[in-house]
């Protein structure tokens, strides 16, 4: 899987003028076991949201940054609003689910920047994603793909099991990839996919865990590009310890 998109596309003025990046920061972070929303968790003097926005801005491919924050953020986590302001990001309150937060961000974009054609949806929990991953996803959108996700090879052997925990199969790792963010979409495709998700039976809809799955369910093809190991998701206390160990200061690769 090799990308040969013209590097000029990453800084083309018309590309920037029609692209937005949404950073999802409204998650509660329950599994992280911190006494604050995940986006507000500290990594060496800065919040996860700050680090995510730093990498996002360094990519240089978006006219507009949008941040979703938890309800009552002004009282519960004012630093998130300060971080968003530092990066001139549009702030909107997120919902109770990831999908609700994405839709809230798309609505805010439609009101503020109706000319946006492409949007990258990024998890704040993947705070140290290199800027080049954003550029690669954005570049793939410009050459005709309507949905693009960064992926990395699966390292572990994966087993499928039944309800009793008995192994039922071993999928080939050659055919499997771990999905990261940012996930990029033509904005009309993403909106249509989420509208379609509302028509699905609850048992089916609840299986959709990210935007790419919604687009798949809608029937649109999803293209993959190369992700990066630094784009790991900070979900558990162990993940947070790893992040603090790997990035004792501002990440040197923030601008790469």
PLM region spans:
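Acidic helix N-cap motif at the loop->helix transition within catalytic regions
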Residues: 75-80
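Short phosphate-binding loop-to-helix
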Residues: 82-118
